[in-house]
Amino acid sequence: MIQQESRLKVADNTGAKEILCIRVLGGSGRRYAGIGDVIVATVKDAIPGGNVKKGDVVKAVIVRTKKERRRADGSYIRFDENAAVILRADGDPRGTRIFGPVGRELREKKFMRIISLAPEVL
């Protein structure tokens, strides 16, 4: 469950290490975002020579959350950290690699490029 001012780890190789959520997209009063939701964020920490730099405003999709999420079959999924993947304007990931597992909810939200790059889909 991600809201404004939440900090997330970046799970790709764009050069950003940490981002801060500044808006949850999808409705005027939307407060929380979960796995598969798109947010607007700013880069808070980045490595030198990366594709993005500190202060850049980016769109990102959430791939892991600490807050458990109930699935249709009654099971729950949760991760050890909050993480996101930075997106281009067309919705594809900006990086070429994804680190760590991602939630199956991304498949239902049509983020197939992220699913194919991820080492594990839970």
Swiss-Prot record:
GO terms for cellular component: cytosolic large ribosomal subunit. Transmembrane segments: none annotated. PANTHER family: 50S/60S RIBOSOMAL PROTEIN L14/L23 (PTHR11761), LARGE RIBOSOMAL SUBUNIT PROTEIN UL14M (PTHR11761:SF3). The gene is rplN. GO terms for biological process: translation. PROSITE patterns: RIBOSOMAL_L14. Keywords: Ribonucleoprotein, Ribosomal protein, RNA-binding, rRNA-binding. This is Large ribosomal subunit protein uL14. It comes from Kineococcus radiotolerans (strain ATCC BAA-149 / DSM 14245 / SRS30216).
